[in-house]
């Protein structure tokens, strides 16, 4: 996963 990947 990338540094910032908000999984909703």
Curated annotation (Swiss-Prot):
Gene Ontology, cellular component aspect: extracellular region
Annotated localization: Secreted
Record keyword Secreted present: yes
Keywords per UniProt: Amidation, Neuropeptide, Secreted
Residues with the Leucine amide modification: 8
Biological process, per Gene Ontology: neuropeptide signaling pathway
PROSITE patterns from the UniProt entry: PYROKININ
Designated name of the protein: Pyrokinin-3
């Amino acid at each position: 996963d990338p540094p910032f990947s908000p999984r909703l």
